[in-house]
């Protein structure tokens, strides 16, 4: 089973400008992500960017680049442009790996591709069991519930499912496992264009979760439990320092 990884990499991050080029252990962040994707066994790895500085950095380490429009409103729109420009066949599997996850395990990149290959959905993703009370009630931690076959029923920033009896207690015991969504997706390439041509749905606008558009229009997303929990991505200067510390420790 072959698959392609596309890594959207925007230079203009509001919280951390120039994020793809941030130095981590002597390499730009985007190079870390690229190398993790190669280790996953991808047939092709493509960096999708709208900035020549990112493109130039990628070319220095031998990365393959697709220049994209600066006007995309989402990473999925950027993905659709790559599929069109690179003439990726409709039945080919494309994995979208965020450009700010330098420590993403190659195993889960491969896993989400295998997940899609083994089901009849046009899209697949991963989740891990929530272990901390803080994440259960944190709206930035997106929860997912799936049916008995692993197809997503809903994604939410709210606490789903709501454990009525246990959450009524003062200590809000986590008696039943809740699943935390991991933001990595595999798509059948032909579906990406279908997705971006749908109008945004009311639910995705309320929750600010793009994947809800897929469920709104009656399509399926298959969810599998990740074999390995990924490290946190880099959204802030503090996150960047944490990743640098991890890399420095591993190098010792």
Swiss-Prot record:
**Enzyme type, top EC level:** transferase
Superkingdom of origin: Bacteria
GO BP: any one term: CMP-keto-3-deoxy-D-manno-octulosonic acid biosynthetic process
Key words of the record: Cytoplasm, Lipopolysaccharide biosynthesis, Nucleotidyltransferase, Transferase
Question: Known catalysed reaction(s)?
Answer: 3-deoxy-alpha-D-manno-oct-2-ulosonate + CTP = CMP-3-deoxy-beta-D-manno-octulosonate + diphosphate
Keyword match Nucleotidyltransferase:
yes
Query: Where does it live in the cell?
Result: Cytoplasm
Name of the protein this chain belongs to: 3-deoxy-manno-octulosonate cytidylyltransferase
Report the source organism.
Vibrio campbellii (strain ATCC BAA-1116)
Q: Which gene encodes it?
A: kdsB
